[in-house]
Amino acid sequence: VLFIYLVIVNRDIFEIHLRSVVFNVVSILTGTGYVTKEFDQWGNFPLIFFLILMFVGGCAGSTTCGIKIFRVHILYYFIRNQLLKIIYPRAIINLKYNNSKVEDKLIASIISFIYLYILIFFVLASMLTLTGLDFITSISGAASSLSNVGPGLGGEIGPNSNYSGLPDQSKW
């Protein structure tokens, strides 16, 4: 999606965009923190896309950061099943993942984890805003530090910047 956006908007060399997008997306998903291009200059859509990727993180068995794709997948199936139960109130719909039933206890723990993750994110972002940082830096700094991603978004902690220029209070 990001690659198609860059080709349409910039109309530059196809291969350069493909390599840059794939590298930066994998870097954000895996939490390695490397960047090849200043993706904050690609426009607003990539910033939102990378912010979402910071939250999602990698796969379940990896040591990457974020909520993890497995939990997001289970949450999606849970919401879908709840909507189906609203449409078909008498239906018995079990949540299945890889052809096996997901226990209610696991669903509850995943929803609790995601809820706490988002709550902590909003608390961190609010605290960073109180230190005098702008909105984009506060939001991306909270997401980046909570998800252990590395690069943030915005001018102060963008792809080719670091956290050294932030106020001391925000580093604690």
Q: Where are the regions that the model predicts?
A:
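Membrane-proximal intracellular helices of multi-pass ion channels
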Residues: 1-172
